[in-house]
Each structure stands twice: as C-alpha cells, then as structure tokens.
C-alpha cells in the first residue's frame, strides 16, 4: 500500500522569486506527498551542492537540471520501493548520485524527494508528520528565535551582522511566545518609523534600516521590548547571527558598516563585550567557517555563558560536527536540511549533536516556501529551538502557524521549551 508508483518534480518559485524544486511522491494507495526545497543566500562552502542550470534563463538560477534528475534517474531508482523505508530510500539516492556532496543530481533534487517520501508515508499511516518522524516522545514546542532586524546578505543595508533576534524565553506556551514576538515586532516598526528609518523588510521578514553598527540595532530592539512591557533577559532574550564568513578575508574581519577591521582575538573580544552588555544568549557563526582557531578561542571565552552555534562551520554535516566536538569548537549546531540533502542525514546530525550534549536548532533558509516541514521537524526532534524568521511574510508565518496547530494537537502533552538557557 505504501509502495512508490510515481515521482513528479517541477520548477516553482521561492519567496525571493527564484526557482526551486517541488516534488510529488505518489503511492500505490493513492496518497501523494508534496515537498518544497528552500535555498540560502549566505551559503557555507562545505554545503551539499544546490544544482542550478546556469545560462540566461532566470539569470542562471533555473533548476530544470535538478527537476530532470527527479523525473528521470531518481524516479527509476525509487519506483517500487516502500515509502516507509526512509533510510534505505535516502541511501539509494546518495549512492545513485555518487559524489560526496550530491553535486551530480543536486541536493535540491534529492532533498525534495526525501521530504516528499516522508510526508507520503506519514499520511498513509494517518499520523501527523511530527509524530511519524519523532515517535511517541515528540512533544517539545521549540522556543522561536525571531529575526526582526535583517542585515548582511539578507538586506540592502550597511549592517554587517545578518540577523538580530528576539527569543521569548519567558513565555509559557508557543502561542504566547508568538504573541510576544508579534507585539515587539510591531512596536519596533513604530519606533523605527518615528525615528525616520525605512520599515521595508528583508528576505526573512525583519526590518532592514540603515544602521552603522550592531549596537544601534540592538538598542532599538531593547527599547521596543521595554516599551511593550517585557523584561529583557527575563522574558525576552536576544540572539545574533553574525554570518562572519561573509566579511572574513585574509585572516581578518572587515566591518564595512563600521569602517573597522578586527583580527581573530579582537573579534572574540568584541563578541564577549556584546554578551556582557546585552542579554544575548546565543551567537551564530561568530567566527568564520574555516577559522577553527577563532572558534576555539570564542568557545573558551564565552562558551559557558552563551550558546555558540555553528552554521557555516558545521553545515548540518555529522562529520564536520564530530571534528568540532573533538576540538571543543562551538557548543551547538544549526540544522538546515538542504545543507546536507536528505531527511535521514539531517536526523543523524541532530542525534550526533545530542549525544555530545551539543544543542541543535532547526532552521529555515532565507529563500523559503509555504512548506511548514521544519515546524514538524522541530517538534519531532525535541530540539527546543527553531529559527524561522520574523513576524511578517507568509513563508515565515506558515511555520509559526503550524507550530500553533501542533501545540493544540498535543494538548496537555505539549511542553514549551522556554528558557533552555537556564
């Protein structure tokens, strides 16, 4: 009944208007699982390969080659297989690709099929996706890390850091956390507008004002939190995604917005000072992806008081994560499914992190779709944290709304992660 009988890939558009892959997996019982593949703007050099067409069509960003792989080789390989055998299906696609980074068929082709297979299997068994993936123990609603000011490659402004996040650690439920975030988001908009700043939003729904420094952005957020009646640090904590690889060149960190250049030790000291000054409990990619020495210095400096998240550093890759664990670099990993390319490898990265007492944070990408898969994945893995953008743009809100539904479905079993930093 759960045998795969057809797979259909197609080219659609993501939240930035760029092509991406959508996949339908048809089962013998008539069930169809549909999945969409996200895409990032700031990509780590060690990520699995997202196959693009090149040429003039869509300015080279078309995905017809990836779609052809879905409708051709992958279809031929998987027809007749049982959708419930997720690991075997993922391994078959990895073997079919035959490269270490999924460069031949494309991680965007392989991931689309992998996720659609899981959705089809879950529906066939009449199970919510989070329950199918996570089993009976899946019950933790993640604390959202809400990106309300965008910078870096996510926005057309001069802020060097990519994301400034609010984290509703003091909420009692996921639904309440979303309310906290929405209220602060709208207050921030008012304060920015009153100060004469642009209130257009960036790729992830956060505002993108012309600030010259990280401190200026943080101060506006702090004022908005207080004006809403919340207590910084107690009810609302802060988080940063520095995306440092984007401004790391020749061993130094070049802050164009500030007109400053910091060496590795100065970068560590700067981040440590920010943590001392503000209620910052998490910093993502504080050091560049290949600055392993810097990561070790940063972890030794503030790793006991602040969550240090490796995104470009680890790229959801268990092997790179194990290297980081051995070195004592970072203490957490960001989980982005398209960085590695299959659901089973994603789950393996989460398990690897948890076994080493590293935290795992489920994350969206800047180029998203209406697919809410990561909301279910966050609950399935009991990770306790999710990054899925601001409180604007339907591609971001689709995930928050799905989490609200899941919390309702779980009823008394639901547990909001809240202040995981305690």
From Swiss-Prot:
Per the entry, the cofactor note is: Binds a second Mg(2+) ion via substrate during catalysis.
Gene Ontology biological process terms in this record: glycolytic process
| Catalysis: reaction(s) | (2R)-2-phosphoglycerate = phosphoenolpyruvate + H2O
Q: Which residues bind (2R)-2-phosphoglycerate?
A: 162, 336, 365-366, 387
Query: Where does the record place it?
Result: Cytoplasm; Secreted; Cell surface
Question: Mind telling me which GO cellular component terms the entry cites?
Answer: cell surface; extracellular region; phosphopyruvate hydratase complex
Cofactor(s) the protein requires to work: Mg(2+)
Name the UniProt key words of this record, in alphabetical order: Cytoplasm, Glycolysis, Lyase, Magnesium, Metal-binding, Secreted
Q: Cite the SMART domains for this sequence.
A: Enolase_C, Enolase_N
Q: Which residues does UniProt mark as catalytic? A: 204 (proton donor), 336 (proton acceptor)
Taxonomy, superkingdom:
Bacteria
Q: Which InterPro entries match?
A: Enolase, Enolase-like_C_sf, Enolase-like_N, Enolase_C, Enolase_CS, Enolase_N
A Pfam family annotated for this chain is Enolase_C
Return the EC number.
4.2.1.11
Annotated pathway: Carbohydrate degradation; glycolysis; pyruvate from D-glyceraldehyde 3-phosphate: step 4/5
Chain residues that bind Mg(2+): 241, 284, 311
- Which GO terms fall under molecular function for this chain's record? magnesium ion binding; phosphopyruvate hydratase activity
The similarity comment for this entry is: Belongs to the enolase family.
Role this protein plays: Catalyzes the reversible conversion of 2-phosphoglycerate (2-PG) into phosphoenolpyruvate (PEP). It is essential for the degradation of carbohydrates via glycolysis.
Protein name as annotated: Enolase
